[in-house]
Amino acid sequence: MLTFLAIITVAYLIGSIPTSIIAGRMLKGIDIREFGSGNAGGTNAFRVLGWKAGLAVTLIDIAKGTIAAVPVVAFFKAHPLGAFPDMNEIALNLIAGMSAVIGHVFTVFAGFKGGKGVSTAAGMLIGIAPISMLMVIGVFILAITLTRYVSVGSILAAIAFPLIIAIRKYLFDLGTGLDYHFFGKWLVHDSLDYHLLIFGGIVAAAIIYTHRANIKRLFSGTENRLTFGRRS
């Protein structure tokens, strides 16, 4: 139990690092939540701080999810604080990753007012199911290219993930996943564990929930399209 609590606590604290708020303070001396969409995420960093800062914020937020889901669990597996949790390891990876997502949305370092969690959730799933996530990223980029609405890309990508896992696992009969090797050595495991379907559905529901205001603006025609380096 102590090891499990340590994993989710460390993962939550990693997710809580308020990347865009730190960037806003460092680059312009502002609280980014008072500008643009008012959100402390990568998309608003693109709008308010410019594309370079927005890209850096997004990549760091992605890394938070990946680190929390995979290296943190691996570290405590090698150095447990007592017994290691007796549960499916992919499920544990997902729980750790979701702890980071919760930390990003409800950051303890910024009054529990963070971002929407899309980049951190993506990072979690990149670490666990990288090939499926490459396909999801393709959906995300295509949706933004066609609509210039990041919210549309985020929602469609979130819905696409469990669908892609289900198609690869059951339609193409790929089992629990594949190991990809480089020069005869293990490189990365691309999981298709059934827990991904469950958590993928949870993540999709959470992303849709955190974008409920965006959905209302989309229907009313007032949603912000993606721009770079402008305050709106």
From Swiss-Prot:
Alphabetic keyword roster: Cell inner membrane, Cell membrane, Lipid biosynthesis, Lipid metabolism, Membrane, Phospholipid biosynthesis, Phospholipid metabolism, Transferase, Transmembrane, Transmembrane helix
InterPro entries named among the record's database cross-references: G3P_acylTferase_PlsY (IPR003811)
Membrane topology summary: Multi-pass membrane protein
Molecular functions (GO terms): acyl-phosphate glycerol-3-phosphate acyltransferase activity
GO cellular component, one term: plasma membrane
Pathway given in the UniProt record: Lipid metabolism; phospholipid metabolism
Gene Ontology BP terms: phospholipid biosynthetic process
Classification via Pfam families: G3P_acyltransf (PF02660)
Keyword Transferase among record annotations: yes
Principal location: membrane
Subcellular location: Cell inner membrane
Catalytic activity of the protein: an acyl phosphate + sn-glycerol 3-phosphate = a 1-acyl-sn-glycero-3-phosphate + phosphate
Membrane spanning stretches: 4-24, 56-76, 90-110, 124-144, 147-167, 191-211
Enzyme Commission (EC) number: 2.3.1.275
UniProt family annotation: Belongs to the PlsY family.
Quaternary structure and interacting proteins, as annotated: Probably interacts with PlsX.
Function: Catalyzes the transfer of an acyl group from acyl-phosphate (acyl-PO(4)) to glycerol-3-phosphate (G3P) to form lysophosphatidic acid (LPA). This enzyme utilizes acyl-phosphate as fatty acyl donor, but not acyl-CoA or acyl-ACP.
Record-given protein name: Glycerol-3-phosphate acyltransferase
Organism the protein comes from: Chlorobaculum parvum (strain DSM 263 / NCIMB 8327)
Gene for this chain: plsY
